[in-house]
Structures are given as C-alpha cells and as structure tokens.
C-alpha cells in the first residue's frame, strides 16, 4: 500500500514535466535486473501507461520562460524517482543520454511564418526586356504585352544588344559585313545603301521611299551616311569589278556572234557555186565513189554452178591412201 502511494505521488510530480521523460525511461526500465513484486509491477505498469499523463500545450509564437527553463530540472527529479521505480543502477552516462533525448529545441514556427509573410510582401522577379527577340511578346511576371520589334532585311541582333548589317554579293553569294549599329533602323539603312549600289533599281529595300544620292540617303530627317568610309570604298571596288566582268562577258558574246556571221557567208558562197555548175553543165559532177562503182558491179563477178550437171567422182579413189590408227582397213575391204 505504501509503494502504491509513493507511485501515485511520483506520478503527480511527473505530470508537469510531460510524457517525454517516461518515453525515454521505458527501455531502461525493461532492462532492470531486479524484478519488482506483483503489486509494485501492476502499479508501475499503471504508472507508465501513456493515458495517465497529459502533455502540456506547446507554446505558440512567444514561448513562456518557465517552459524553457523547465527541462533543466529533469536531472534532479531523475535521481529522486530512480529509487522509487528501481533505477538505482543507472550510470551517469545513461542519465546524460536520457537528458539529451529530452532536451529537444523548440520548432521555429514563428520564424517560418514570418518568412512566408515576408515572401508574400516581396516583389516578384522580372526578366530584363529583350528587344531583339520576336517571340518574346510578354514579359515574365507581367500581364502587359511588350511591343515586338520589326524585322528588317539583312539585319540581325547580337546577344549583347547591338545590331549587325550584312549583304550577300550577287556574284559568289558571299556575305559582306557592313558594320555594327546601335539601332535596327540604322542597320537597315546601311543594308539599303549597299543593296542599291550593288543592284540598282532592282534592289529590295527596307525603306523604298527614301532617295539615294551617292553614299548618302535623303529623307525627312535630312542627309544621312549609314556606311563607314572603309566599307563604302570596298563596295565601290566590288561594283567596279562587277562592271568590268559584265563588259568582258558582253565582248565575248559579241565576238562569238561575229564569228558565226563570218562563217555563214563562206557556206552560202559554196552552195551558190555548186548550183551554178549544175545549171551550166546540165549534169551534176561525178564523185570518186560513183566513178569506182561505174566500171564493174559486184553482181557481175558472182558465178553459180549449173544444177543439171552430175557430180564428177574419181573412180580410182581408194581409202588406203588415208590410213587410220583406229580402223583396220584391210579387214573391212577384204
């Protein structure tokens, strides 16, 4: 009866500390060598049942100071209750292990909630504006569509934002670099100037309404020189070489036509001479082939035997003149 009263008072003293201490003491209680009596075992099992204890409510965002300092009293309480339950043989290392299992840090719930609340109030990340990409019509994180840039002929954008103008030469189809520009319109004007120099009025221009005067382009904005002087000089040299090759092609074609015209009168004169000779002589001139075939025809040289004449056999013909090693002619003729 006294043991039961001691266990009851011990259980009342442990209710304030919670059920975590008893969960940590369960494996050590089972390994105790001294087995208690039946009455003390029944009371101990009733004492260790988890329904006999009620966990204190965990503090919210602002924990109480008494709750934080409460686990430090478990070491002194453990030595007092060890004699009641039968844990006198626990070593100091085991006691420290139990204390380390009990002293868990509190979950930082208020810190996480504050972080989530600050994430809701923080601005959304936005991508940088990409003006050269035609497909990026919408910016990331914004519902307002961005204005797509116009694409020009012979113009492309570098990945760092600059614009480059290039043109293909009509002869060998190679690309000629025209320069790097800050805007797409400047690069398009440079392409128009180069295309007009190479192809003239047949060029396809980005701005066909502008007028081209030498190396300048005129419009409502005034006179503008889009190409660099070195690029302009290179274009002039290319245009001169193209003009020279065109002149050479035209000269070769005209010379071929003249050769055809010179050769055609000679043939006509030969035909006319032959016609005149036929009309004067009355008969065409005899060729060498006709002269060779006129003397004798190939049919006159052929001779055929008369089928009515009997064949002439030689009666003195004997087979002995033609001996053979396989046939015995003496036995045959005997």
Curated annotation (Swiss-Prot):
It is found in: Nucleus. GO terms for biological process: cellular response to salt stress; cytokinin-activated signaling pathway; ethylene-activated signaling pathway; regulation of cell differentiation; response to cold; response to heat; response to light stimulus; response to osmotic stress. Mostly expressed in roots and leaves. Also detected in flowers and stems. It comes from the Eukaryota. Keywords: Activator, DNA-binding, Ethylene signaling pathway, Nucleus, Transcription, Transcription regulation. InterPro entries: AP2/ERF_dom, AP2/ERF_dom_sf, DNA-bd_dom_sf, ERF/AP2-like. Residues 261-275 have a biased composition (Basic and acidic residues). One of its GO terms (molecular function) is transcription cis-regulatory region binding. GO terms for cellular component: nucleus. Residues 243-317 are annotated as: Disordered. SUPFAM superfamilies: DNA-binding domain (SSF54171). The keyword Transcription regulation applies. SMART domains: AP2. The keyword DNA-binding applies. Gene3D superfamilies: AP2/ERF domain (3.30.730.10). Residues 151-208 bind DNA. Interacts with BTB/POZ-MATH proteins BPM1, BPM2, BPM3, BPM4, BPM5 and BPM6. Belongs to the AP2/ERF transcription factor family. ERF subfamily. Probably acts as a transcriptional activator. Binds to the GCC-box pathogenesis-related promoter element. May be involved in the regulation of gene expression by stress factors and by components of stress signal transduction pathways. This is Ethylene-responsive transcription factor RAP2-4.
């Amino acid at each position: 009866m006294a043991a039961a009263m001691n266990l009851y008072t011990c259980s009342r003293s442990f209710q304030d500390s919670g059920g975590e201490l008893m969960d940590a003491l369960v494996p050590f209680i089972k390994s105790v060598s001294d087995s208690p009596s039946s009455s003390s075992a029944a009371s101990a099992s009733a004492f260790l049942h988890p329904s006999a204890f009620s966990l204190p409510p965990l503090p919210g965002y602002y924990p109480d100071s008494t709750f934080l300092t409460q686990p430090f009293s478990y070491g002194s309480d453990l030595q007092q209750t060890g004699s009641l339950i039968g844990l006198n043989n626990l070593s100091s290392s085991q006691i420290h292990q139990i204390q380390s299992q009990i002293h868990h840090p509190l979950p930082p719930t208020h810190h996480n909630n504050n972080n989530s609340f600050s994430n809701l109030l923080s601005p959304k990340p936005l991508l940088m504006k990409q003006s050269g990409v035609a497909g990026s019509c919408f910016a990331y994180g914004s519902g307002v569509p961005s204005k797509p840039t116009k694409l020009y002929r012979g113009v492309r954008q570098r990945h760092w934002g600059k614009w480059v103008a290039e043109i293909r030469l009509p002869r060998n189809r190679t690309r000629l670099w025209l320069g790097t520009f800050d805007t797409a319109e400047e690069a398009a004007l440079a392409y128009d100037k180069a295309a007009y120099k190479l192809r003239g009025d047949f060029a396809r221009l980005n701005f066909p309404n502008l007028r081209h005067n030498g190396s300048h382009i005129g419009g409502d904005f005034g006179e503008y020189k889009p190409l660099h002087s070195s690029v302009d000089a290179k274009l002039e040299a290319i245009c001169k070489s193209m003009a020279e090759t065109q002149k050479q092609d035209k000269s070769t074609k005209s010379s071929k036509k003249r050769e055809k015209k010179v050769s055609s009168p000679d043939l006509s004169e030969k035909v006319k001479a032959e016609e005149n000779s036929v009309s004067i002589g009355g008969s065409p001139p005899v060729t060498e082939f006709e002269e060779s075939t006129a003397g004798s025809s190939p049919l006159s040289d052929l001779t055929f035997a008369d089928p009515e004449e009997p064949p002439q056999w030689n009666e003195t013909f004997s087979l002995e003149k033609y001996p053979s090693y396989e046939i015995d002619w003496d036995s045959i003729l005997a």
